[in-house]
Every structure is written in structure tokens, then in C-alpha cells.
């Protein structure tokens, strides 16, 4: 099974973050501009939470709050569940299911080195299965 390190090597390690005191509107703009569903909420080098489109929908829109006047701190999900580069894709999927989260920051030596989403994991599993199918077909035809 593929490790998170291998997945990050393929997809890239670009991180998008926001400060806890920033307005939710700014977070939504960054997510839209970067085509991502969540941002790390960072205080310096420390992760204080994650803010996602789901947090926005449930904690701003449904509550009738203003995205321009609400700080990210008020809607972020915390504490954050993290994984290490050695964690398997399978273990990440298990954690996401158990904790009902869609994004996992990846930490190494106390630093955030990437983030994986449920979409990243599904793509990795599909690619791995496709490779296995191709190997089996090659074996059968040889």
C-alpha cells in the first residue's frame, strides 16, 4: 500500500493556510482561487485548526452569520488529526472515516509538510488498482 510520502511526491506539497483572526470571507476566496476545499489555520508555524467549505456552510451560512465579520477562529475545526509521511493511504482512509474528516495535515519533525484530502486518497487507490489490473493482464497474456 502506498505511503503518504509517496502520495505527496506525486501530487506536490503545496500548502495553503490562513491566520485564525482572518475573516471567513478571505478564507473562502483563497479556497476558490486555489481550487481547494480546506485551509490550514496557522499561528506562526503551529497548526491551530482546519477551515473547510463544510465549516463555512454549517457554521456561517446555516447560522445566518456574516462571512466578512466572522473570524476563521470561530468556525475552524480543532484539534486537528494529523498523519506522518510513513502513514499508509489505507490508514489515512480509516482515520478519515473514524474521525469524519476530509483533510489530514502531514507532519514530520513537528512541521507541517503537506496535506492530503479524501480525493487525493481515492485517486491514489484507483491508480494503484489500475496498475495491478495492468500487471495481471500482462501476466495473463504472456
What are these regions (language model features)?
Residues 31-34, 39-55, 96, 104-119:
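A glycine-centered beta-loop-beta connector
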Residues 35, 44-46, 67-70, 77-79, ...:
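Short, surface-exposed, polar/charged, turn-prone segments marking secondary-structure boundaries
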Residues 22-33, 62-74, 110-111:
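Short, charge-rich amphipathic segments
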Residues 2-48:
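A positional/architectural concept
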Residues 1-13, 52-82, 88-97, 118-142:
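Tandem CBS (Bateman) regulatory domains
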Residues 16, 48, 114, 124-125:
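Secondary-structure boundary/capping motif
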Residues 17-35, 82-100, 107:
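The conserved cystathionine-beta-synthase
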Amino acid at each position: 500500500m502506498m505511503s503518504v510520502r509517496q502520495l505527496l511526491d506525486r501530487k506536490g506539497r503545496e500548502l495553503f493556510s490562513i491566520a485564525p483572526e482572518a475573516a471567513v470571507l478571505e478564507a473562502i476566496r483563497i479556497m476558490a482561487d486555489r481550487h481547494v476545499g480546506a485551509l490550514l489555520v496557522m499561528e506562526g508555524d503551529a497548526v491551530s485548526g482546519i477551515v473547510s467549505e463544510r465549516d463555512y456552510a454549517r457554521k456561517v451560512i446555516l447560522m445566518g452569520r456574516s462571512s466578512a465579520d466572522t473570524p476563521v477562529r470561530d468556525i475552524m475545526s480543532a484539534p486537528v488529526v494529523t498523519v506522518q509521511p510513513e502513514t499508509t493511504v489505507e490508514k489515512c482512509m480509516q482515520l478519515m472515516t473514524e474521525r469524519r474528516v476530509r483533510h489530514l495535515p502531514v507532519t514530520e519533525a513537528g512541521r507541517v509538510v503537506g496535506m492530503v484530502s479524501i480525493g487525493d486518497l481515492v485517486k491514489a487507490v484507483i491508480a494503484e488498482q489500475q496498475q495491478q489490473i495492468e500487471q495481471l493482464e500482462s501476466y495473463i497474456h504472456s
